[in-house]
Design a protein with these regions (language model features):
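Basic nucleic-acid-binding interfaces
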Residues: 1-3, 9-10, 55
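Short N-terminal amphipathic alpha-helix/helix-capping patch enriched in small hydrophobics
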Residues: 25, 29-32, 46
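Generic recognition of well-ordered alpha-helical segments
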Residues: 13, 31-34
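Short alpha-helical linear motifs
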Residues: 31, 52-55, 70-75
């Protein structure tokens, strides 16, 4: 089963800045997106719901320091990417 990654314009702007600051993470970031698309519940992503506000968001790990926040729509199998950055930037 495959999921649809939805890149909003806002996310693409955040992503562009993130990759410009961290070009060394490009391969790991691409692998994380591929895993999200194939199996968002893969243990290495450490997918978990975020507590508090805003509600309805989840977090997936790129590595120990960087995360992707996302909305997970299981019925439509859509994953709406919200933000990417360090732990402090996305929470």
């Amino acid at each position: 089963m495959s999921y649809n990654l939805i890149f909003t314009e806002q996310y693409e702007n955040i992503e562009r800045r993130f990759l410009k600051r961290h070009p060394d993470l490009l391969d790991r970031y691409a692998k994380t997106l591929a895993m999200l698309e194939h199996d968002p519940f893969h243990p290495s992503l450490r997918l978990h719901p975020l507590q508090g506000r805003p509600t309805g968001l989840h977090s997936a790990s790129i590595n120990l320091q960087y995360r992707i926040t996302l909305e997970l729509e299981l019925r439509e199998q859509d994953i709406i990417l919200v933000s990417v950055g360090s732990h402090g930037e996305v929470y």
